[in-house]
From Swiss-Prot:
This is Serine--tRNA ligase. CDD domains: SerRS_core. SUPFAM superfamilies: Class II aaRS and biotin synthetases, tRNA-binding arm. Pathway: Aminoacyl-tRNA biosynthesis; selenocysteinyl-tRNA(Sec) biosynthesis; L-seryl-tRNA(Sec) from L-serine and tRNA(Sec): step 1/1. It is found in: Cytoplasm. L-serine binds at T230, A231, E232, E284, S384. One of its GO terms (molecular function) is catalytic activity, acting on a protein. Its EC number is 6.1.1.11.
């Protein structure tokens, strides 16, 4: 959520940001509603002042033996007007808040211009794509041939875009989770949490999934619960309506969770295999920082996610997301994309974002620099560290052998009891 004071004092900032995003939101309409609220508050304050004056005059006049009937009538009228204006202010506040919840974040000045993912800017690459002396198979075919992935049985049990991991497939997924958590906790200094997989509506509003993207969420019918689309939601909301001590910042959490996404607009895009599932596993990195350090912390967070792929020895690249591809909540975002041989292109495995105070303002997460200092909103950041299903997919594709077997990355072998080849 954006600060209405910022919009009021410098509406051109928002207008330019929305123009970059090609968003036709009516800024002038918002300002008119805000002005109406402010005028109503002034009128309300004047009526309350008059009410207070009269409340002092009535006992004085009574003591002096004066007639107070007209004052009593005026007090009754004032009370009715105040009640009506109070209700009007509450109604305007609700309307303003509902509107503010639909406005996207203002992109950072360094975000590249562009309309789609084709305009994202490559920042760096790591590793060289492997040259195969045979035609590489797609990961779903490799997994089915090795009997470690079963899409047809999952479709029978649940539906399309679900998977059974079996045998060494399940163990590989679990090995990835343990490896990533160990790396981020032991080397990168994150504190692990294991969050609930269900959250209520206010939590989804706090991190920006609602109200705008409700169609992409799985809601539990007849309740106010939603299945989480990412651990970002419960972990960020751990600090809802809380004032943190500046000495505790940055707070760094890592969390494993299952993630659930309807992906309503994703039909036909990478829907075969493990790339775009309705349910998938992910290790998430979440940070709470001061405003002045958040972009430095974004670089560190991105490097932490990259190290997962370096240790797995998977070729990847980092791209800075252009304004047309930037998510609703992010001020700046990097995508980390892994090389997928069967696709002959890079595929996203992690998004690392700085939301500045956009989420903190929605969720009421603040910090205080000193005992008598006014609380300020923290900056929140998060990134996949990384998506486990996509990591499994890129391991199967990049480490496949001509005989159909798959070599296990060296760093995972200790988590698989020394197994070096899946065959």
């Amino acid at each position: 959520m954006l600060d209405i004071k910022l919009i009021r004092s410098n509406p051109e900032i928002l207008k330019k940001a929305l123009q970059k995003r090609k968003d036709n939101f009516d800024v002038n309409g918002l300002l008119s509603l805000d002005e109406k609220r402010r005028k109503t508050l002034v009128e309300l304050e004047q009526l309350r002042n008059k009410q207070n004056e009269n409340s002092k005059l009535i006992p004085k006049y009574k003591k002096e033996g004066k007639d107070v009937s007209s004052l009593m009538e005026e007090m009754k009228s004032l009370s009715e007007k105040i009640k009506a204006l109070d209700a009007e202010v509450r109604k305007i506040d609700e309307e303003l808040n509902a509107i503010l919840l639909t406005i996207p974040n203002i992109p950072h000045e360094s975000v590249p211009m562009g309309d789609s993912d084709e305009d994202n800017v490559e920042v760096r690459r790591w590793g060289e794509p492997r040259k195969f002396d045979f035609t590489p198979k797609p990961h779903w075919e490799i997994g089915e041939n090795l009997d470690i992935l079963d899409f047809s049985k999952a479709a029978k049990v649940t539906g399309a875009r679900f998977t059974f991991y079996k045998g060494l497939g399940a163990r590989l997924e679990r090995a990835l989770m343990n490896f990533m958590l160990d790396l981020h906790v032991d080397k990168h200094g994150y504190v692990e949490v294991f969050p609930p997989f269900l959250v209520h509506r206010n939590s989804m509003i706090g991190t920006g999934q609602l109200p705008k993207f409700e169609e992409d969420a799985f809601k539990v019918s007849d309740t106010d619960y939603f299945l989480i689309p990412t651990a970002e939601v419960p972990v960020t909301n751990m600090y809802r309506e809380q004032i943190l001590d500046v000495k505790d910042l940055p707070i760094k959490h890592v969390a494993y969770s299952a993630c659930f996404r309807a992906e309503a607009g994703a039909a036909g895009r990478d829907t075969r295999g493990l790339i775009r599932q309705h349910q998938f596993n992910k290790v998430e990195l979440v940070k709470f920082t001061t405003p002045e350090t958040s972009y430095e912390e974004l670089e560190k967070l991105t490097r932490d996610a990259e190290e997962v792929l370096q240790m797995l020895e998977i070729p990847y690249r980092v791209v800075k997301i252009c304004v047309g591809d930037l998510g609703f909540t992010a001020a700046m975002k990097y995508d980390i994309e892994v090389w997928m041989p069967s696709y002959n292109r890079y595929v996203e495995i992690s998004s690392c974002s700085n939301f500045e105070d956009f989420q903190a303002r929605r969720a009421g997460i603040k910090f205080r620099r000193g005992l008598n200092e006014k609380p300020e909103f923290v900056h929140t950041l998060n990134g996949s560290g990384v998506a486990m299903g996509r990591a499994t997919a890129c391991i199967l594709e990049n480490y496949q052998q001509e005989d159909g077997s798959v070599v296990v990355p060296k760093v995972l072998r200790e988590y698989l009891g020394g197994i070096s080849v899946i065959k």
